[in-house]
Amino acid sequence: MSESVHTNTSLWSKGMKAVIVAQFLSAFGDNALLFATLALLKAQFYPEWSQPILQMVFVGAYILFAPFVGQVADSFAKGRVMMFANGLKLLGAASICFGINPFLGYTLVGVGAAAYSPAKYGILGELTTGSKLVKANGLMEASTIAAILLGSVAGGVLADWHILVALVACALAYGGAVVANIYIPKLAAARPGQSWNLISMTRSFLNACTSLWRNGETRFSLVGTSLFWGAGVTLRFLLVLWVPVALGITDNATPTYLNAMVAIGIVVGAGAAAKLVTLETVSRCMPAGILIGVVVLIFSLQHELLPAYALLMLIGVLGGFFVVPLNALLQERGKKSVGAGNAIAVQNLGENSAMLLMLGIYSLAVMVGIPVVPIGIGFGALFALAITALWIWQRRH
């Protein structure tokens, strides 16, 4: 069935504003909840290697539900899917507030996030189109990164004051996102009437994976974004252990401040990409990807706070410039071939598989006692080499 798309090309339509507000509040809750829950694990004396496990159960939900969430996003009005997904996040955060095992509560938040992602990105192609799609992605990424900036800091600072207050603030953010979703126009479903047989859905998802992988442009985008987000999540957890070792600071807030520097940088980089990169010139983003790994390596050797702030902001600028064009490329090409929701679901599978793999390797490295600074050096070097290999591969094909 052909994809039905209802577009309003304005970047500041009522629907777009509602999407951006909902995304900000939802992402704020995600990031505040991570650091609040990490503080809870520390307070309850969980081992250090369990910290990345928290994120692994979150991304495990993405992988488990990947064959189904794309069809959900394309079979219903995406604004309503976003509202349901934020409701699941609210339930997960509330369960942690009431003393349920934090890993179980965070898994429920992961299920909500898995359902939310294809809808939030897929709806951009229904609210705007053509040359403005990259700019719409820039707005979405800027909103997300602003939420990462404020949410991460709020989670760490509030947790230093009172962990329960931090957890309640996360639940309230998710509640606000549910309300914002109400104001998103109820657009027609992109691909209604598809089979809900689980075997058929899995087969359809695998067909979408195959279709996107066979296309050189979407394959390039999938690999690039997967490497970036896998590395980004690993860096976040590396900072939690790096700060007390390299800087001698043991509070919950400092790692969140450092993460905020990355967030600020990504806002700048996303804005630059929206102005300087088009769907026809996506390869311009590749040098920035290589430099991310180089700067991470240099950062790992620092022992002063000010250079650490500056280098992390630079990593963010490079990251924003690298990932925004790749996201836009996948949405535009994927919308035409397998549907925007399915394209983003396939992207989520790739990104979260990369996260799971990188976090697993990182957790294992911590468990066997490798010092955090050598971990950071090796991590940066491997990332730079991986993006270099991807660029060479893309140019040859």
Swiss-Prot record:
It is found in: Cell inner membrane. GO terms for cellular component: plasma membrane. InterPro entries: LysoPLipid__transptr_LplT, MFS, MFS_trans_sf. Keywords: Cell inner membrane, Cell membrane, Lipid transport, Membrane, Transmembrane, Transmembrane helix, Transport. Its main location: membrane. It comes from the Bacteria. CDD domains: MFS_MefA_like. Residues 1-17, 74-90, 166, 248-256, 302-304, 365-366 are periplasmic. Residues 39-52, 112-144, 188-226, 278-280, 326-343, 388-397 are cytoplasmic. The chain crosses the membrane at residues 18-38, 53-73, 91-111, 145-165, 167-187, 227-247, 257-277, 281-301, 305-325, 344-364, 367-387. It is a multi-pass membrane protein. GO terms for molecular function: lysophospholipid:sodium symporter activity. Belongs to the major facilitator superfamily. LplT (TC 2.A.1.42) family. HAMAP family: MFS_LplT (MF_01585). PANTHER family: MACROLIDE-EFFLUX PROTEIN (PTHR43266), MAJOR FACILITATOR SUPERFAMILY (MFS) PROFILE DOMAIN-CONTAINING PROTEIN (PTHR43266:SF2). Catalyzes the facilitated diffusion of 2-acyl-glycero-3-phosphoethanolamine (2-acyl-GPE) into the cell. This is Lysophospholipid transporter LplT.
